[in-house]
Design a protein with these regions (language model features):
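Anionic group-transfer/hydrolysis microenvironments
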Residues: 14, 46, 123, 159-160, ...
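Short, hinge-like loop/turn segments at secondary-structure boundaries
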Residues: 26-29, 84-88, 113-115, 136-139, ...
Length: 177
């Protein structure tokens, strides 16, 4: 960016705060000074900062600032269930996936995805955290019930042996993978 003549500023999300009003909405930084108008924002957001960071991005968006990843796309990508629903809507094949609210549905959920082995995922986890391979039905029941006892939202997915423990990440830019 600098080689192309752009000026770059780095802002720590946790040190930004906002002013909302009808005439002069603003984003401020650290010592209280308003951030000067920006041409673009390239957000890098940790999962724990999603709610607050997306609120800031929505204000940037409403001020007409281009955001490389807009708030809606970040929120969609952080919600595994919603992401899977969006992929299905576009005709993308996904592993058979189950989602339920009650531990009473555990056995039906396990059978729905083809039985064990299966994958149990926390909806909020990232980078492989909160992902468990349950090799037996008993292990699956234990993991699901443990997560449910913590009121955690989980997905149960069929295990795809051919994936060899890896997932595939693709970027789509201007309609091309």
């Amino acid at each position: 960016a600098e080689q192309r003549g752009h000026e770059i500023e780095f802002y720590n999300i946790r040190q930004c705060f906002m002013k909302l009003d009808a005439t002069t909405p603003q984003i401020h930084y650290r010592g209280g000074s308003a951030i000067e108008p920006l041409d673009a924002v390239i957000p890098r957001i940790r999962p724990a900062q999603t709610f607050y960071a997306c609120a800031l991005l929505r204000l940037f968006e409403s001020l007409g600032v281009f955001c490389l990843n807009n708030s809606d796309s970040i929120i969609q990508s952080r919600d595994k269930l919603f992401s899977l629903q969006l992929l299905l809507k576009q005709g993308v094949q996904i592993p058979t996936t189950g989602f339920a609210s009650s531990p009473l549905d555990t056995n039906d959920l396990i059978e729905m995805v083809g039985g064990s082995p299966l994958i149990v995922k926390l909806l909020e986890g990232t980078q492989g955290k909160g992902v468990v391979l349950a090799e037996t039905k008993k292990a699956a029941e234990s993991v699901i019930n443990a997560f449910k006892s913590l009121n955690a939202n989980i997905l149960v997915q069929e295990f795809i042996k051919e994936a060899d423990g890896k997932d595939l990440r693709c970027f789509v830019i201007d309609g091309k993978v």
